[in-house]
């Protein structure tokens, strides 16, 4: 089977995570991608590098505001005095609270980040973008006649919402692949093997 993989995932190296109130190093490390790559290589699968599929596949799933935030958040955050090395939200809007769309990076982080599992570092946007390219490329391989293709996506994407990072995820690769398949096929089935319901499948 063809396995679509980009070493750009190594640019995403999150450090910050909170577990039961304790700050810990994130489990979503570059070593995860390396282990998965080693496993598929050991089983004899063919590794291919994705093409750059442009912005359209992710724009078909995520809002322009959210994509702009992901692309610019790190640089804007680092302009703050005494800022941390990663973007981590510390304030969030809540149901019933009247609010307009924020313009300050602290407010934007709270608006677009659902938890502390998805800090944004210097390489997060590029890594997430190429992860989405992997998903799109694998979907295109199937459209081109492959019976199956595997996208080795890191950072993962299946818990990202249309306008919010969540659960280690930034761009929803499952939804991006499904939307790409829907450019040809009206209906696409998603089989979710995670331990709980993935986000953004009802699009």
Regions found by a protein language model. Give the residues of each.
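HDAC/HDAC-like amidohydrolase catalytic core signature
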Residues: 1-191, 196-201
């Amino acid at each position: 089977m063809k396995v679509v993989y980009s070493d750009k995932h190594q640019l995403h190296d999150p450090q910050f995570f909170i577990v039961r109130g304790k700050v810990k190093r994130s489990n979503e490390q570059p070593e995860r991608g390396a282990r998965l790559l080693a496993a598929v290589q050991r089983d004899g699968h063919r590794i291919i590098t994705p093409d750059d599929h442009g912005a359209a596949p992710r724009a078909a799933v995520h809002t322009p505001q959210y994509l702009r935030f992901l692309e610019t958040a790190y640089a804007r955050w680092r302009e703050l005095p005494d800022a941390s090395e990663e973007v981590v939200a510390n304030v969030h809007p809540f149901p019933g609270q009247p609010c307009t769309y924020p313009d300050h990076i602290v407010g934007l982080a709270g608006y677009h980040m659902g938890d502390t599992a998805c800090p944004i570092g210097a390489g997060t946007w590029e890594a997430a973008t190429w992860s989405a390219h992997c998903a799109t490329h694998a979907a295109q391989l199937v459209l081109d006649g492959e019976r199956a293709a595997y996208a080795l996506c890191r950072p993962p994407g299946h818990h990202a919402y249309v306008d919010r990072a969540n659960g280690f995820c930034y761009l929803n690769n499952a939804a991006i692949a499904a939307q790409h398949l829907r450019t040809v096929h009206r209906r696409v089935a998603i089989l979710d093997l995670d331990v709980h319901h993935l986000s953004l499948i009802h699009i």
